[in-house]
């Protein structure tokens, strides 16, 4: 049986080496996020200040996989 993963939204607060980021979730938790392979393959840039969707395992709630970069409301891209 496949493990159930929780999906949260958060804000990138800090960029770390090797595609890792510090993410502040909407419930104010601070976790470590890494970029999923699909985002890495598509060369999607993630910068501090971006809003993202992050997938967190129920076994380790301190790490998560960034699965989607949300569009900013004020930018035109």
UniProtKB/Swiss-Prot annotation:
GO molecular function term, any single one: rRNA binding
Residue ranges of coiled coil: none
CDD domains, per database record: S1_IF1
Keyword Iron belongs to the record: no
Keyword tags: Chloroplast, Initiation factor, Plastid, Protein biosynthesis, RNA-binding, rRNA-binding
Subcellular location: Plastid, Chloroplast
A Pfam family per the record: eIF-1a
Residue ranges occupied by any S1-like domain in the UniProt entry: 1-71
Primary location class: plastid
One GO CC term, this protein: cytosol
Role summary: One of the essential components for the initiation of protein synthesis. Stabilizes the binding of IF-2 and IF-3 on the 30S subunit to which N-formylmethionyl-tRNA(fMet) subsequently binds. Helps modulate mRNA selection, yielding the 30S pre-initiation complex (PIC). Upon addition of the 50S ribosomal subunit IF-1, IF-2 and IF-3 are released leaving the mature 70S translation initiation complex.
HAMAP family documented for this protein: IF_1 (MF_00075)
Quaternary state and interactors: Component of the 30S ribosomal translation pre-initiation complex which assembles on the 30S ribosome in the order IF-2 and IF-3, IF-1 and N-formylmethionyl-tRNA(fMet); mRNA recruitment can occur at any time during PIC assembly.
The family this protein is said to belong to: Belongs to the IF-1 family.
Name assigned to this protein: Translation initiation factor IF-1, chloroplastic
The organism of origin for this protein: Calycanthus floridus var. glaucus
């Amino acid at each position: 049986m496949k493990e159930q993963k929780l999906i949260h939204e958060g804000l990138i607060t800090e960029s770390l080496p090797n595609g890792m980021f510090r993410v502040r979730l909407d419930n104010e938790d601070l976790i470590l996020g890494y970029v999923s392979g699909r985002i890495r393959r598509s060369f999607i840039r993630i910068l501090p200040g971006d809003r993202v969707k992050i997938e967190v395992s129920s076994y380790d709630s301190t790490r998560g996989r960034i699965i989607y970069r949300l569009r900013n409301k004020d930018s035109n891209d």
